[in-house]
Amino acid sequence: MSVEVYRQKIEKGGYSAAYEATRRYERGEIEVLSWSSRWESAWSKFGEAVKALGKIEGAPRALVIAKVQEALAYMSKPLPNMKLAMAAAVQAVRACEQLPGMNRERCLDAVAGALGVAKDWIRREMTGGGGGGGGGGGGGGGAVV
């Protein structure tokens, strides 16, 4: 597939197409991925964040990964929805805090690193004016776990 086809797939299909394109780029199957350098960086950081969570299994870890993926999907749209992305990021941090050995700062570092955003943006959503909404989202995350 050409780079242009992958670009169109990402615009339509979001994260799964980006994942596929990034993997093909890493294998050398496509040469130019300048349009998705943001994705390449995001996936690299996401992989680092998952490693930071260790080999812990279970629902909270799966929820952290799912919420980070959700936030990345919101951020990757042609018109990114940062409000929904940050809400998903807050839920990821709250789920991460439930994991053994993890605290808020480590979770903020992992999630912010995976998303390529400043952890203060997520912290502000958790504690600032958007904190009430973030708290509600955290409760919803608790119900899923």
Swiss-Prot record:
One of its GO terms (molecular function) is DNA binding. Keywords: Disulfide bond, DNA-binding, Virion. GO terms for cellular component: virion component. Disulfide bonds join C96-C107. The keyword DNA-binding applies. It is found in: Virion. Heterodimer composed of major capsid protein 1 and major capsid protein 2. Self-assembles to form a helical, filamentous nucleocapsid. Together with capsid protein 2, wraps arounds the DNA and maintains it in an A-form. Capsid proteins probably maintain the DNA in A-form by non-specific desolvation and specific coordination of the DNA phosphate groups by positively charged residues. This certainly protects the viral DNA under conditions such as the extreme desiccation of its host. This is Major capsid protein 2. The lineage of its organism: Viruses, Adnaviria, Zilligvirae, Taleaviricota, Tokiviricetes.
